[in-house]
A protein has these predicted regions:
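Divalent-metal-activated hydrolytic enzyme cores
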Residues: 21, 38, 106-130, 166-236
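Short, well-ordered beta-to-alpha junction loops that form the rim of enzyme active sites
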Residues: 48, 146-150, 192
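Glycine- and acidic-residue-enriched helix-capping/strand-helix junction motifs
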Residues: 55-63, 161-171
Length: 236
């Protein structure tokens, strides 16, 4: 399955600024097919979310049970990939986007810099192309990715160095998530709990829906932080 590149204004949930991802596509999630073991749902996932030790410090980010649970289903095929490990190895420096979002990096208008100032823009773009190639080859139907990441973020990322004395967040996607979105793939984050609830209704007929689950953009932190604009200061 090969997806044509979509203009940003055709991508759902991007608000007034097409380069800023604001919400998940719940309509799409509700239309997902019911998978079977013979024809499993193909989900691309940030490898760190499944317990693989590919975090920047060589540890896994396996603290999200709502994502780890996907490993238990025979009717789900997980395609696990860490773009930063692919491009820069593990362990590695932490990196963030400076001067825009992942879309801006793809357009040559922003850079990816490590905490020590090394420019990793080229490597990150190459990693995004590798992730896109994998998604197309495997015909993935959804991507579940690590938010905040300069590579995999889909709702919120840092605006500049996350280790700055006054850290700043912004609404937007990381480089690899932006690459996938531009080519028609749907992306949700590990913090989009309402969207994950919809996903589980498709793969588990016995799943009891948590009606109080909300997505990242619906949290009090998000609403308070971004209420006056797309950037701000504070802790999450």
């Amino acid at each position: 399955m090969i997806f044509a590149t979509l203009p940003d204004h055709f991508l759902p949930g991007f608000g007034d600024n097409p380069k800023n991802a604001r919400m998940t596509d719940r309509f799409y999630l509700n239309q997902l097919r019911i998978p079977t073991p013979d024809n499993p749902l193909r989900i691309l996932v940030s490898a760190c979310l499944t317990g693989i030790a590919c975090g920047y410090d060589g540890t896994p980010y396996g603290q999200y049970p709502s994502v780890l649970k996907l490993l238990n289903y025979a009717n789900v095929r997980l395609i696990r990939f860490c773009p930063e490990d692919y491009a820069f190895g593990t362990p590695r420096e932490m990196c963030d986007i400076h001067g825009g979002t992942g879309f801006d990096v793809l357009d040559g208008q922003a850079r990816v810099l490590t905490e020590s100032g090394e420019d990793w823009t080229g490597g990150m773009v190459q990693a995004s192309l590798k992730m896109l190639e994998l998604a197309q080859r495997e015909a993935v139907e959804l991507a579940v990715m690590m938010d905040i990441s300069a590579a995999c973020g889909s709702q919120v990322i840092y605006a500049g160095n996350r280790f700055a004395q006054q850290k700043v967040y912004q609404i937007g996607a990381g480089v690899c998530a932006a690459q996938l979105m531009r080519h028609g793939f749907k992306v949700i984050s590990q913090r989009d709990y309402a969207s994950l609830e919809i996903l589980y209704t498709k793969i588990d007929p016995e799943h009891v829906v948590n009606g109080e689950a909300i997505d990242q953009h619906e949290t009090a932190w998000y609403q308070n932080y971004f209420g006056a604009g797309e950037k701000g200061s504070g802790e999450q």
